[in-house]
């Protein structure tokens, strides 16, 4: 939420003030449950979506922000489910395999979605890396399977797929896995949410404000 000109800075400051007030209205006394960095991420998401309800939908599990900051400082790769998310992330090591030729081949051969196939192809990068999913519940389910069945250990999973088919269920399943994660309750999520979260963590890793 940066700005260059004086007018831009004034707008940014006013916007941040409005966002914070909206968050306070939504959370009430629950606002004390979140630490400073978590509040910074919540502010980013609310700003990106113009939807204060996200303040009560975001779930942080197993110190995900701190783990994400460490992973970014160690220059770990980020694996995403769609190229739109890749385009929005301010980081060099971002990978998306959804359009990889091998993904098309495996998906067709095995009768699975390309999203699932892309996560299987990225398995070695996911292990000790960061996963950011904002669109595909099946991709998130596959990452969870890799964690449970193949002992893959991501540093952080940002799981915020959007939609009314399997999205809520995939995020519930993520919260049951013992890995650092950030997710949303219910069907809401999507690219803007995913990008806002991971860019906030990247900003923290660079010692900037979220």
Swiss-Prot record:
One of its GO terms (molecular function) is cobalt-precorrin-8 methylmutase activity. Its EC number is 5.4.99.60. The active site is at 47 (proton donor/acceptor). One of its GO terms (biological process) is cobalamin biosynthetic process. It comes from the Archaea. InterPro entries: Cbl_synth_CobH/CbiC, CobH/CbiC_sf. Keywords: Cobalamin biosynthesis, Isomerase. The keyword DNA-binding does not apply. It catalyses: Co-precorrin-8X = cob(II)yrinate. Belongs to the CobH/CbiC family. Homodimer. This is Cobalt-precorrin-8 methylmutase. It comes from Methanocaldococcus jannaschii (strain ATCC 43067 / DSM 2661 / JAL-1 / JCM 10045 / NBRC 100440).
């Amino acid at each position: 939420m940066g700005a260059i000109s004086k007018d831009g800075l004034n707008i940014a400051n006013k916007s941040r003030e409005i966002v914070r007030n909206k968050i306070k209205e939504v959370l009430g006394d629950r606002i004390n449950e979140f630490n400073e960095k978590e509040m910074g991420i919540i502010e980013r998401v609310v700003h990106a979506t113009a939807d204060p309800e996200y303040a009560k939908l975001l779930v942080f599990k197993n110190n995900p922000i701190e783990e994400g900051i460490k992973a970014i400082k160690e220059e770990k790769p980020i694996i995403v489910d769609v190229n739109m998310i890749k385009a929005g992330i301010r980081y060099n090591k971002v990978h998306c395999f959804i359009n990889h030729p091998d993904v098309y081949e495996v998906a067709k051969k095995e009768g699975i979605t390309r999203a699932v196939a892309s996560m299987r192809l990225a398995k070695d990068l996911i292990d000790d890396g960061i996963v950011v999913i904002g669109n595909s519940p099946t991709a998130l389910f596959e990452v969870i399977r890799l964690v449970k069945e193949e002992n893959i250990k991501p540093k952080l999973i940002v799981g915020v797929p959007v939609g009314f088919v399997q999205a809520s269920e995939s995020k519930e399943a993520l919260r049951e896995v013992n890995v650092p994660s950030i997710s949303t309750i219910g069907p809401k999520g999507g690219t803007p949410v995913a990008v806002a979260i991971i860019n906030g963590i990247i900003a923290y890793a660079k010692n900037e404000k979220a």
